[in-house]
Amino acid sequence: DDWTDAHRCASLALVELDKADELLAQQGDAVMNQLVCFVANQWKKHYDRPDERVVCRLTDTLFAIGCADKTCAELAEELRGIYAEMPRECVASVGLMRRVAFTQSIGCACTGEVRGKNWDALYKLCEERLAAAKTAGGDQVCAG
């Protein structure tokens, strides 16, 4: 609420590792934990500024990114640029060192797309867009 009171809008993105269950089955818990930490650190490089940008882990493989003063289109463009430059492999150092390939799907939305300060509706819209990105094959940003 502070963001929407102090800024023109706020945007939210949900970011999830694609095929996480398959990765877990193939790689095991220890490698998966290392992969999730690697991914989290990649996003934290860009979105760990509490006054205007924040990233947090919601579940084992799901992250939320929030930005003040960005529309959905602006956040989506920024996310696409960052994701395009992000490594798509993590060097797992558990057991024998090996590269673990991964992709991510992202769904984002803006407070301007929902009525009032309805955070539940904003989250639901992000979930729908994340599902659309995954349904379309993953490895992409869906912004509506």
Where do the protein language model's features map onto the residues?
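A short glycine-enriched loop-to-beta-strand structural element that forms part of the catalytic core
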Residues: 11, 56-62, 66, 92-128, ...
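Residue-level recognition of strand-loop junctions within catalytic nucleotide-signaling folds
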Residues: 25, 66-70, 87, 109-112
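Conserved long alpha-helical elements within nucleotide-processing catalytic cores of c-di-GMP signaling
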Residues: 1-12, 18-45, 56-60, 73-80, ...
